[in-house]
């Protein structure tokens, strides 16, 4: 089944832009072989990508993306089935937002659309694209440092704490507004 997956992430500070360009070129070759299409937006700090293709292939590629050390804070924004491809001709089209105005990027994304029903702003996936472009990808984003920079320090022992042999369950769940 044709699947659309959208995610965003943050580029590691140590990765130069030429590595991004090399990655895009390699992904285009792989995506063509795997029947994956989509777009990649980059604002100099954040990636926003829409992938579309066979469900298992999209999910496998996304799992590889999540493990890629060139970026972090990977957040899946949408995963849904689609009746047709939105970007059937683009293996992975890169839009560098630093080089184009907001309206120009939005129009270029619309121009790359191949759906028999032209992409419109009412399209759910395009609403994500539009929001990323218009907010410069930074508004409303709480940046979490990379996992390898975290330090967890225990607070002083609480007298009301459960005994050390008591079973504990802790669950961290990300919240997205």
Locate each region found by the language model:
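Charge-rich, low-complexity N-terminal segments
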Residues: 1-177
């Amino acid at each position: 089944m044709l699947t659309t997956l959208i995610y965003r992430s943050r580029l590691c500070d140590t990765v130069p832009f030429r590595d991004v360009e090399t990655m895009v070129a390699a992904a285009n070759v792989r995506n063509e072989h795997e029947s994956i299409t989509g777009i990649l937006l980059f604002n100099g700090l954040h990636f926003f990508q829409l992938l579309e293709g066979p469900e298992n292939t999209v999910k496998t590629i996304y799992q590889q993306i999540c493990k890629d050390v060139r970026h972090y804070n990977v957040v899946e924004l949408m995963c849904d089935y689609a009746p047709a491809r939105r970007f059937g001709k683009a293996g992975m089209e890169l839009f560098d937002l630093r080089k184009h105005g907001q309206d120009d990027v939005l129009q270029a994304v619309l121009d790359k659309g191949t759906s028999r029903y032209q992409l419109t702003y009412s399209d759910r996936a395009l609403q994500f694209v539009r929001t990323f472009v218009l907010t410069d990808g930074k508004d409303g984003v709480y940046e979490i440092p990379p996992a390898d920079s975290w330090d967890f320090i225990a607070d002083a022992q609480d007298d009301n704490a459960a005994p050390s042999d008591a079973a504990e369950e802790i669950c961290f769940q990300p919240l997205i507004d």
